[in-house]
Design a protein with these regions (language model features):
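SAM-dependent transferase fold signal centered on methyltransferase-like domains
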Residues: 1-166
Length: 166
């Protein structure tokens, strides 16, 4: 990853590997997986949760509008023919691109704001969206209007673009 000092990358790998050993065992078993900053590791779904979600929905096309580290998207993609991962943070997109390839997944990665991508996207069978539940100071939020993206603001557009929202 460009512009990140090697010692920071090494520290992230060590911390990420420890967290993944418990939370994402199949990722931990893949020696080429690259890990993000600790907060992204702590906030991502566990492998077991992501596998459970993947049993609940299936279809032709899936769009994950809040990709994050890509754990949910990775496992959900097993139930879809075409999967698109959308994430606003460039570094997470770089990691997802690398990690999906390392895991043999064919997932289209898009670096964009959820709202911008949603505006112009083709309809999908399923839209997966897991909004951030922290404010800009890192505090937890509980109201839908305080999540990012604000589901109340984009709810109608989401319903126009998919058969199922999860």
């Amino acid at each position: 990853m460009p512009n990140i000092p090697a010692h920071i990358i090494q520290a992230r790998q060590e911390v990420g590997q420890k967290i993944a050993a418990e939370k994402l065992p199949s990722w931990a078993a893949c020696p080429t997986i690259q890990y993000p900053a600790r907060l992204s590791m702590e906030q991502c779904s566990s492998e077991w949760t992501a596998r459970y979600k993947s049993q609940l929905i299936k279809g032709e096309t899936l769009v994950d509008l809040t990709g994050g580290l890509g754990v949910d998207c990775c496992f959900l993609s097993e139930s879809f023919t075409h999967t698109t991962y959308v994430e606003q943070q460039p570094e997470l997109c770089q990691l997802a691109t690398h990690n999906f390839a390392s895991l043999g997944k064919h997932i289209h990665v898009v670096n964009a704001q959820c709202e911008d991508y949603l505006e112009n996207m083709q309809p999908a069978d399923v839209i997966f969206i897991d909004p951030a539940r922290r404010d800009n100071k890192g505090g937890k939020v509980v109201l839908l209007a305080d999540c990012t993206p604000n589901l109340l603001d984009i709810g109608n557009k989401l319903l126009q673009k998919c058969q199922t929202m999860y």
